């Protein structure tokens, strides 16, 4: 917001300044957090930001100064790896559940996705992945 020509007074929209996908996501998240919700549902909230920005956002979400249950729907493993509980759904059915480490040890869909997103061949993954 500070980088926009008029800061908080900048008009956004069809006749206003265009925002990138990542900027839209960050502003939407900031608006959601401004009301200090008890429950926050985030659907691919960081899909359009770079990895460094995602790390920063995740760190800030962990340090919220109020109680907030966070439900994170994501494609990126990096978005959910620090969650207390991760659920993998297929056709509306939970097929895997656990922490990041537990799901890696199961060597199921989560593990395969982790390997794919991190450039690791599942069959030759080093033991430290587990």
Language model features: what each stretch is:
Residues 46-47:
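Short loop immediately C-terminal to the Walker-B catalytic DE motif
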Residues 34-38, 67:
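A short, proline-enriched helix->beta-strand linker immediately N-terminal to the Walker B motif
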Residues 51-52:
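Helix N-cap at the start of a conserved alpha-helix in ABC-type nucleotide-binding domains
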Residues 40-43:
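Catalytic Walker B motif of ABC-type/P-loop ATPase nucleotide-binding domains
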Residues 63-74, 80:
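Conserved catalytic loops of ABC-family nucleotide-binding domains
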Residues 1-7, 59, 67, 81-130:
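C-terminal portion of ABC ATPase nucleotide-binding domains
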């Amino acid at each position: 917001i500070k980088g926009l020509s008029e800061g908080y007074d900048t008009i956004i929209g069809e006749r206003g300044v265009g925002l990138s996908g990542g900027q839209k996501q960050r502003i939407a998240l900031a608006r959601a957090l401004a009301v200090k919700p008890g429950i926050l549902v985030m659907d691919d909230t960081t899909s359009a930001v770079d990895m460094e920005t995602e790390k920063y956002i995740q760190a800030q979400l962990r340090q919220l100064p109020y109680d907030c249950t966070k439900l994170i729907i994501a494609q990126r493993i990096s978005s959910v790896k620090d969650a207390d509980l991760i659920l993998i759904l297929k056709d509306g059915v939970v097929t895997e559940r656990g922490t990041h480490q537990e799901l890696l040890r199961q060597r199921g869909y989560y593990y395969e996705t982790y390997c794919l997103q991190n450039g690791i061949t599942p069959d030759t993954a080093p033991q430290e992945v587990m």
